[in-house]
Swiss-Prot record:
UniProt cross-references to Gene3D superfamilies, sorted A to Z: 3.40.1360.10, 6.10.250.240, RecR Domain 1
Species of the source: Alkalilimnicola ehrlichii (strain ATCC BAA-1101 / DSM 17681 / MLHE-1)
Annotated zinc fingers (C4-type), start-end: 57-72
Gene: recR
Family the entry assigns: Belongs to the RecR family.
SMART domains listed in its UniProt record: TOPRIM
Protein name according to UniProt: Recombination protein RecR
Keywords on record: DNA damage, DNA recombination, DNA repair, Metal-binding, Zinc, Zinc-finger
Record-level Gene Ontology MF annotations: DNA binding; zinc ion binding
Any single Pfam family the record assigns to this protein: Toprim_4
Xref: NCBIfam families: recR
A biological process from GO: DNA repair
Length: 199
């Protein structure tokens, strides 16, 4: 059913969010219009301001309102450690879950030749230039354990090795609290092969 042009536009606009289909977008639109107009206005203002003011850090490419993010600007970070991630959300996840004190480089994706995503689309030339500066002593690869993520990690490892930079990969395996019988065979095989001494 078609509603008024403005309601249709709102519903269609909400569908740009990941995981939001037509029914969810319709429910959200009606909720904002019927029950939370102030919340809708705050949401609209927050979206507008974020879209206008948030960009990418010119050093690590994480989302920030400043030319250089707080992580890169901090003198408390270990500049010899560089963790390479696929997206800005990965930086926030690692910052919340780990005590990593190094810096980051955000790829904004992963290599995917079938989709036309090559090294230049990921800014790997910028990463290579950063490695050439000589400050980075270890690159920590924190890409997804997918075919594309592994290919991306392999490509970056080659760049790092050419510069004599140590390269490590985050461990993948059985999640905390997970039952072995429910873990897929690829994950289980990878976890078993990557076993370490028990202290």
């Amino acid at each position: 059913m078609r509603y008024s042009p403005l309601i249709d536009q709102l519903i269609e606009s909400l569908r740009c969010l990941p995981g939001v289909g037509p029914r969810s977008a319709q429910r959200m639109a009606f909720h904002l219009l019927q029950r939370d107009r102030d919340g809708g206005r705050r949401l609209a203002t927050a979206i507008r301001e974020a879209m206008d003011q948030v960009g990418h850090c010119r050093q690590c490419r994480v989302l920030t309102e400043e030319p250089v993010c707080g992580l890169c600007a901090s003198d408390r970070r270990d500049r010899s450690l560089l963790c390479v991630v696929e997206g800005p959300a990965d930086v926030f996840a690692l910052e919340q879950a780990t005590d990593f004190r190094g810096l980051y480089f955000v790829l904004m994706g992963r290599l995917s030749p079938l989709d036309g995503v090559g090294p230049e689309a990921l800014g790997l030339d910028r990463l290579e230039a950063r490695l050439a500066e000589g400050e980075v002593q270890e690159v920590i690869l924190a890409t997804s354990p997918t075919v594309e993520g592994e290919a991306t990690s392999h490509y970056i490892a080659e760049l790092a090795h050419q510069r004599g930079v140590r390269t490590t990969r985050i461990a993948h395996g059985v999640p905390m609290g997970g039952e072995l019988e429910y873990v897929d065979s690829g994950t289980l095989s990878h976890a078993f092969a990557g076993r370490r001494d028990y202290d």
